[in-house]
């Protein structure tokens, strides 16, 4: 569509500039305060849309594969490249991205190029973490275990003698 960026144009865009993309919903977080945070992808790349303006009615329509046009600003927070202050419009079209195996990219700088994509890691084993009492657990809510259900989940997995932390 006219005025819509390709993924390459989006990736090359400077931070804090307006971006317009068309992509497909691959996942979403819960609706809250007339906002939604969503993971989008097309055949060329992936996008993280942080707190897009969204009615509860439209939230229900954002099922996996739904095509949307997003207008917002490219930003970054804690290494996460995202589209902020965004609005969206639902379009015709559907695409569900296949999971890309990125196991071989663990521990490399190339992994960040797959940021926000639907990915899979294979052959990994959950490695225990320690809670505040020194007990081995499979995961923690918040980095230090001080959280509860609904907070960020931290867990470790190992492969070939290396341990990786996922959030």
Each predicted region: which residue ranges?
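OB-fold single-stranded nucleic acid-binding module
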Residues: 1-167
């Amino acid at each position: 569509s006219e005025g819509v960026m390709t993924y390459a144009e989006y990736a090359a865009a400077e931070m804090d500039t307006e971006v317009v993309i068309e992509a497909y919903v691959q996942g979403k977080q819960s609706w809250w305060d007339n906002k939604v945070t969503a993971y989008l992808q097309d055949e060329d790349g992936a996008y993280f849309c942080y707190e897009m303006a969204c009615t509860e009615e439209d939230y229900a329509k954002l099922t996996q594969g739904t095509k949307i046009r997003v207008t917002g600003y490219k930003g970054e927070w804690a290494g996460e490249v995202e589209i902020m202050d965004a609005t969206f419009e639902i379009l015709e079209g559907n695409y569900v991205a296949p999971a890309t195996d990125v196991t071989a990219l663990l521990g490399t700088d190339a992994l960040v190029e797959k940021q926000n994509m639907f990915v899979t890691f294979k052959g990994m084993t959950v490695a225990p973490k320690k809670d505040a009492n020194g007990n081995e657990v499979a995961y923690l809510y918040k980095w230090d275990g001080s959280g509860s259900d609904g907070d960020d989940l931290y867990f470790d997995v190992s492969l070939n003698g290396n341990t990786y932390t996922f959030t």
